[in-house]
């Protein structure tokens, strides 16, 4: 239970230490934030997908919107817009599910990291797909987005 919190704290501490270094370039900084975002999204997905999660069938009934096209960091605005509904859904099962008890912390971390990556501007109007996705698909697609962005930055 505390190992997830410790891992999250260690990862955040490493990001903060790395970001305080004067030699850090903006691209390297963005990559580090993306790596932190990736970790937080993966932790949420692990908690939801846990084979002992009795609430998974209920969680899969809630639907989320994905952007039509998410290829740039500015598209993280679309993720941010769905964090409120995601938080609400996870709160429904959090009290009785030990695997999701840190969901609020992960959502807060994701919100802060997204703000750092996309900036404070809310100029992008998200164009969402007409079809909705489950919470598992939602997190999986954003994980793929982060992995793709990190891969692009390291080339």
From Swiss-Prot:
SS bond list: 78-126
An MF annotation (GO) of this entry: growth factor activity
This protein's UniProt keywords: Adaptive immunity, Cytokine, Disulfide bond, Glycoprotein, Growth factor, Immunity, Secreted, Signal
Domain of life: Eukaryota
Glycosylation sites: 23
One GO BP: adaptive immune response
Annotated localization: Secreted
Gene Ontology cellular component list: extracellular space
Signal peptide segment: 1-20
Pfam family, one: IL2
Similarity comment: family membership: Belongs to the IL-2 family.
Listed name of the protein: Interleukin-2
Organism of derivation: Meriones unguiculatus
